[in-house]
Amino acid sequence: MAEEAKSKGNAAFSSGDYATAITHFTEAINLSPTNHILYSNRSASYASLHRYEEALSDAKKTIELKPDWSKGYSRLGAAFIGLSKFDEAVDSYKKGLEIDPSNEMLKSGLADASRSRVSSKSNPFVDAFQGKEMWEKLTADPGTRVYLEQDDFVKTMKEIQRNPNNLNLYMKDKRVMKALGVLLNVKFGGSSGEDTEMKEADERKEPEPEMEPMELTEEERQKKERKEKALKEKGEGNVAYKKKDFGRAVEHYTKAMELDDEDISYLTNRAAVYLEMGKYEECIEDCDKAVERGRELRSDFKMIARALTRKGSALVKMARCSKDFEPAIETFQKALTEHRNPDTLKKLNDAEKVKKELEQQEYFDPTIAEEEREKGNGFFKEQKYPEAVKHYSEAIKRNPNDVRAYSNRAACYTKLGALPEGLKDAEKCIELDPSFTKGYSRKGAIQFFMKEYDKAMETYQEGLKHDPKNQEFLDGVRRCVEQINKASRGDLTPEELKERQAKAMQDPEVQNILSDPVMRQVLVDFQENPKAAQEHMKNPMVMNKIQKLVSAGIVQVR
């Protein structure tokens, strides 16, 4: 149950529904309160909703449950950064690195927290972006509340909150300036009186360019312009990709990368183009670069997972020739550790399935299978049943379509008392070849040993349809009838009757019959109302169910 709730939480988180994710993770925690991963996942969900206090609490609980798990300190550091407690964030990342010194995510987090700590001491606006108060103020103000529904605005404010010096890059964004005014409790621009006095002059003059409230350095201005040009190139690349003009798409994505190397989506997009073009080596190279650069930039886990998934897809394409799916499987598994995406999980399952099928094809050898089966027969005759099972199992691996190997192994399991395993092999015989009579005799014998006499009789009767004169089947039916009649006549000892009834009550069919209100009334009528019982006996469905209860020892005929 906890695992199911966790899976639902992961799916909701993947779709961006963080509130629902929190609900599911909370349900999972209630079912499994000592699972540190659940607290870690809920911490990430709280952080995504800017609820950093709750994120911090869950991060601390994660570490309490699993103090040697480095990811817990990554969650703790992220929560402290969200609360603008940069000293504590630095300490958290350092503690995580003591456990896992090579963890790139912790290294990036430490560098980020250290930069933010330095900038927070020199930036006059840093107090405006402190912790959850920033999001509460923006939510409370009607003018900025609508902006929080815009993903690019939320992303921008997160960047500024992480490093207040980034404010200079977004001074032309009216939404950012509006938000800054709300946070500082001031209004940027002239008063309404000044606006009225200047109205006439404004109507006569050409509108002047909007002045930047704060001057950008030349380097910052150039960086912003490059980012804008890069996004434009990306947009044109997307258009070309949709038109399947892959050559032009590659050109645009390459230009975008040259203009801005801090956005790995240009690399993953170009990798997607290479994948479509069949240039798998180039695709893999771009994906590797995206992962490496993404870790340096501390990019979103989803972006890194996307790059790994794309690499895995390229490796699958290549494996169709090389027949080596292991690299693709490993890559998909890495992607899932970054971000559990249903599409990636499906790709992993498909790759594992194909790998297994290939292994079975390569291992298939009827000649060796027959040799192994004969070896098993030799050990069976010597009553060395465990050794016989070993050789029959190898024969099945070499040729999974040979019913004789399953039949022989079923006989071994029966001798060893492993009746459920023997029953499974006998049913496999019938599945592979319904006309293979030995499968019915094996299955019927095992069911008889399990004291499931009604089921054994059905199996023998099914076998008689394929071989009406088979003496083994006829004898099997006779033995089953004798056992069933013993129960119906009351010839069983109290212990035998109790055992048979207890076994019958485990049968879902018997449970359904006894829980059916109509059948319960029928049983009462058979005891108390002979006239009604006579009417019931005319109904074939009712009598079949009565016979089932008689066979199971639940009902006795006096």
From Swiss-Prot:
Keyword Lipoprotein: no
Residue span of motif Bipartite nuclear localization signal: 227-244
Biological processes annotated in GO: chaperone-mediated protein complex assembly; heat acclimation
Pfam families: STI1-HOP_DP, TPR_1, TPR_11, TPR_16
A GO molecular-function annotation: preprotein binding
Domain of life where this protein originates: Eukaryota
Compositional bias (Acidic residues): 209-218
A GO cellular component annotation in the UniProt record: cytosol
Disruption phenotype: Decreased thermotolerance after a long recovery (2 days) under nonstress conditions following an acclimation heat treatment.
Alphabetized PANTHER family for the sequence: HSP70-HSP90 ORGANIZING PROTEIN 3, TPR REPEAT CONTAINING PROTEIN
This protein's domain notes: The tetratricopeptide repeat (TPR) domain, forming a carboxylate clamp (CC), mediates interaction with the highly conserved 'EEVD' motif at the C-terminal ends of HSP90 and HSP70.
Protein name: Hsp70-Hsp90 organizing protein 3
Gene that this polypeptide is encoded by: HOP3
